[in-house]
């Protein structure tokens, strides 16, 4: 079992937040594309080192890597969510199968861009045998909710609710010069 936390160096975290703060529209993605590409490569290399550290320190067979990347812009109303992180490069660096681009595919199919949360919530509720119906609140950077009504009928729904920890993180970065999340 691996119980380890892999933190971005402060300088790298600042670069991510600085670039994210500049990108407020779809057009900004093009304006800052050179910076995005450089940061994406740096992030992917960091994640490849994390994957290799995990592989080295476990005796478990790893079938594939799920790679979310780092959200830099998100606007489901315009059917776009941009994460930096190159799944193909991560696959090359780790020599493993990498599954990626979760959010954009979900948005293109009418979702909010968080396709894994409801699937995980449904499996968790079923495994620990929670009585239905149930509502699960996930407070991450953006809060989302999963409502599960019935397993047999596959009756469940999920959606974003609004800001979660991102507001606290932004306040701490601005006022305390540190990181919350």
Predicted regions: what they are:
Residues 2-42:
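Conserved non-catalytic scaffold segment of RNase H-like nuclease domains
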Residues 49, 53, 89-92, 123, ...:
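Residue-level signal for well-ordered alpha-helical scaffold segments within enzymatic catalytic domains
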């Amino acid at each position: 079992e691996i119980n380890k936390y892999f933190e971005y160096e402060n300088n790298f975290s600042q670069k991510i937040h600085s670039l994210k703060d500049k990108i407020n529209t779809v057009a900004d993605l093009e304006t800052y594309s050179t910076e995005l590409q450089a940061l994406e490569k740096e992030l992917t290399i960091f994640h490849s080192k994390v994957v290799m550290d995990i592989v080295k320190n476990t005796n478990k067979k790893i079938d594939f890597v799920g790679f979310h990347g780092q959200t830099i812009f998100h606007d489901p109303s315009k059917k776009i969510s941009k994460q930096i992180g190159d799944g193909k490069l991560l696959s090359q660096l780790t020599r493993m199968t990498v599954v990626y681009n979760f959010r954009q595919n979900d948005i293109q199919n009418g979702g909010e861009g968080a396709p894994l949360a409801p699937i995980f919530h449904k499996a968790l509720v079923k495994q620990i045998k929670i009585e239905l119906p149930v509502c699960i609140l996930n407070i991450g950077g953006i809060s989302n909710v999963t409502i599960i009504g019935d397993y047999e009928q596959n009756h469940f729904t999920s959606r974003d609710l609004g800001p979660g920890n991102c507001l606290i993180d932004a306040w701490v970065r601005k006022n305390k010069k540190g990181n919350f999340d």
